[in-house]
Regions:
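C-terminal-of-GTPase-core extension/linker across diverse P-loop GTPases
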Residues: 1-8, 16, 84-86, 90-151, ...
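N-terminal accessory targeting/assembly segments
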Residues: 1-243
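Conserved G1/Walker A P-loop phosphate-binding module
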Residues: 1-103, 290-401, 411-415
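Conserved nucleotide-binding/hydrolysis micro-motifs of P-loop NTPases
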Residues: 21, 85-89, 156-160, 189-191, ...
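Conserved C-terminal guanine-recognition region of P-loop GTPase G domains, centered on the G4
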Residues: 67-70, 87, 162-180, 205-212, ...
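Flexible beta-alpha connector loops of hexameric P-loop NTPases
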Residues: 157-162, 191-196, 254-260, 299, ...
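Conserved phosphate-handling catalytic cores of large alpha/beta enzymes
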Residues: 249-268
Length: 524
C-alpha cells in the first residue's frame, strides 16, 4: 500500500472484514461504502458494522475531522491512518474507535500515535471487548416494553420557536404510534435542501446522533420527496420516515371498520407508490414497525403494476361504500332530520362531547386520532324534536393529501351537514394555530358555506377570565364536555336552531342510528 501510494501520489485505503478479507479498495480521501457493502454489512441490532478502514497518507498528520466523522457515521470497528514517508517507509499509525454513550459525551476516542512496527494490539480481542461495551451501553439506554425509539427532526424556514412547537406535536404523534422520543433537532433553512432536506453535513450529524443514542429511526416533521428519501437511505441503513408516514401509521392502528381500513390502505399505497422506483434492497428498510402498518412489506415489494392494480381495486371498493352512503343519506333526508357534524383538531374532545350529548359510549381516549370511523347518534330535545349528531375524523395542520383523497367518502359526510360545530381545545398550547388549520381544511373541502358555531372545549382547565375574553374575541361558546352543567347554553341554542328549521319529527321512522334522550332535567 505504501509503495502504491508513492506511485500514484494519492491516499489508498482498504475496508477489511473481521476475518481480514479485503471488502473494498478506495482511492482518495472520501470514504463512501458501496450499496453492496451497505447491504452485506448492516449494523441492524449490532453496535458496529464489522468493518475496519485503514488508509495511507503522504504526510504525517493526525486523523482529520472528516475521518472521525466517517468512523461515527458508518459505525466502523476502527479507523486507522498510516503515514507514508517519502522514502517509502511506513511511519506513525493513527487509530480511533467509537465510545459507548456516557457522561463524557464523546463519540470516539483517538489513540496516541505509535510507530506502525510497534503495534501490539490484538484486533480480535479489542473489537470483541469494544462491541460488548457498546452493547451493554445500548441495553442501558434501550426503551422498555419493546417500543421503538426515534430522533425527531425539523428543517424549515420557520422560526426556532415555531419549529419547537411543531416538534412537540410530532412527539405527540410519535407517542400515539407507540414510539418513544429520545431526542429532537431543529434546523432553520431558507429553503429545503433539494437532496437531503438538510445539508449533507447536517444530515450526517443527525444520523450520527441517532446511532450514538441508540435510536431506531429518524422522523422528519416535513414530508420527504421520493428523491430525498432515496438519497437519505443511500447514506444509512437507519429507518427514516416522515410526518405523513407517521400519521398514516396511526390511522392504520385506529381503523376498525372495513371502510376505514380500505381508506387507510389506499392512502398508504398512494404515498408509497412513487417511492418504490429504483429502491432495490433499500425498500426492505420500510418493512416492519412504525411507518409500514397496513399494506405490509410483501405487498409493497411486488412490481409497480401490482401496486397500481391494488389501488384500482381499493378505489372501486370505496366507490361502493360511497353508493351505500348516498343511500343512507337519502333515507335520512326523507325523514327530515337535521344533521349536525362535529369537526375540529384531533384530540379536541369531539367524541367526548358526542358521548355526553347522546349518552353514547364511543371510544374517547386522550390521544391523537382516536376517532377514525364516522359515528352518528340521535339527539332528542323536549317536544320530540330530534337531530343527528355526527362525529368524524379529527384534523391536523398540513393534513396529508393522501388522507384527504382516500377519506373522501368520510369527509363527504360533512357536506351534508346542516350545521358544523367546530370544537377547539381551549387548553391547547397553540389554540390559534389549530383554529386556523381547521378553518383552512374546511375551506379546502369547500365547506365554508355551511353554517358553523365555534365551541371552546375544556374551559374548566382555563381561568374563567381568560375563557370570557377568548369567547368574546372569537364569538365562541365556552364548554367542558366533562362538565354537563356547562353544556346548557349549547343545548338551548341547538334547540332554538332546530325549532327555526321547522322540522317535524316522524317518530315512527327507522333511522339507522341509536336513539338516546337528553332533557334539561338530566343536566340539573
Amino acid at each position: 500500500m505504501a509503495q502504491l501510494t508513492l506511485e500514484i501520489r494519492r491516499p489508498l485505503g482498504v475496508l477489511l472484514t473481521r476475518r481480514g478479507q479485503v471488502q473494498e479498495v478506495i482511492v482518495g480521501t472520501e470514504l463512501t461504502l458501496s450499496s453492496t457493502t451497505m447491504t452485506l454489512f448492516r449494523t441492524g441490532t449490532r453496535s458496529l458494522r464489522g468493518l475496519r478502514f485503514v488508509r495511507t497518507q503522504l504526510h504525517d498528520q493526525p486523523l482529520s475531522q472528516e475521518a472521525l466523522t466517517d468512523l461515527a457515521f458508518l459505525r466502523l470497528d476502527l479507523i486507522g491512518i498510516l503515514a507514508v514517508e517519502e522514502d517509502g517507509r511506513i511511519g506513525n499509525l493513527y487509530l480511533a474507535h467509537l465510545l459507548p454513550p456516557g457522561s463524557t459525551g464523546q463519540l470516539f476516542k483517538v489513540l496516541k500515535a505509535i510507530p506502525f512496527h510497534n503495534l501490539t494490539i490484538s484486533f480480535d480481542t479489542f473489537i470483541e471487548e469494544l462491541e460488548a461495551d457498546l452493547q451493554c451501553a445500548r441495553a442501558l439506554h434501550a426503551v422498555g416494553n419493546g417500543k421503538e425509539s426515534a430522533i425527531l427532526v425539523s428543517a424549515s424556514a420557520k422560526s426556532r420557536a415555531e419549529q419547537e412547537e411543531q416538534l412537540v406535536e410530532l412527539a405527540e404523534l410519535a407517542t400515539s404510534a407507540g414510539v418513544t422520543v429520545i431526542g429532537r433537532m431543529a434546523q432553520r433553512t431558507t429553503d429545503g435542501h433539494q437532496r437531503y432536506l438538510l445539508g449533507s453535513g447536517k444530515m450526517k450529524d443527525v444520523l450520527i446522533q441517532t446511532l450514538h443514542r441508540g435510536a431506531d429511526m429518524v422522523i422528519f416533521d416535513q414530508t420527504l420527496s421520493p428523491a430525498q428519501l432515496r438519497a437519505i437511505l443511500e447514506m444509512t441503513d437507519i429507518k427514516v420516515i416522515d410526518r405523513t408516514q407517521l400519521i398514516l401509521d396511526i390511522f392504520a392502528r385506529r381503523a376498525h371498520s372495513r371502510e376505514g381500513k380500505v381508506q387507510v390502505e389506499l392512502a398508504q399505497l398512494r404515498y408509497l407508490l412513487p417511492r418504490l422506483s429504483g429502491r432495490g434492497t433499500q425498500l426492505s428498510r420500510l418493512g416492519g414497525g412504525i411507518g409500514t402498518r397496513g399494506p405490509g412489506e410483501t405487498k409493497l415489494e411486488t412490481d409497480r403494476r401490482r401496486v397500481r392494480d391494488r389501488i384500482t381495486h381499493l378505489e372501486r371498493e370505496l366507490a361502493q361504500f360511497a353508493r351505500h352512503q348516498d343511500q343512507r343519506r337519502a333515507r335520512r333526508n326523507r325523514y327530515g332530520l337535521p344533521v349536525v357534524s362535529l369537526v375540529g383538531y384531533t384530540n379536541a374532545g369531539k367524541s367526548t362531547l358526542l358521548n355526553v350529548l347522546t349518552k353514547s359510549h364511543v371510544s374517547a381516549q386522550n390521544r391523537l386520532f382516536e376517532t377514525l370511523d364516522t359515528t352518528s347518534r340521535r339527539l332528542r330535545f323536549p317536544e320530540d324534536r330530534e337531530i343527528i349528531i355526527t362525529d368524524t375524523v379529527g384534523f391536523i395542520r398540513d393534513l396529508p393529501q393522501e388522507l384527504v383523497g382516500a377519506f373522501k367518502t368520510t369527509l363527504d359526510e360533512l357536506r351534508e351537514a346542516d350545521l358544523l360545530l367546530h370544537i377547539v381545545d381551549m387548553n391547547a398550547r397553540d389554540i390559534e394555530v389549530q383554529l386556523t388549520a381547521v378553518e383552512s381544511i374546511l375551506e379546502e373541502l369547500q365547506l365554508s358555506s355551511v353554517p358553523r358555531w365555534l365551541l371552546f372545549n375544556k374551559c374548566d382547565q382555563v381561568p374563567s377570565q381568560q375563557v370570557e375574553v377568548l369567547c368574546r374575541r372569537f364569538g365562541a361558546i365556552g364548554i367542558s364536555a366533562l362538565e354537563p352543567t356547562t353544556l346548557r347554553p349549547l343545548f338551548v341554542r341547538l334547540e332554538a336552531y332546530v325549532r327555526s328549521l321547522s322540522v317535524e319529527d316522524d317518530r315512527t321512522s327507522h333511522v339507522t342510528v341509536q336513539d338516546y334522550e337528553l332533557t334539561f332535567s338530566s343536566r340539573r
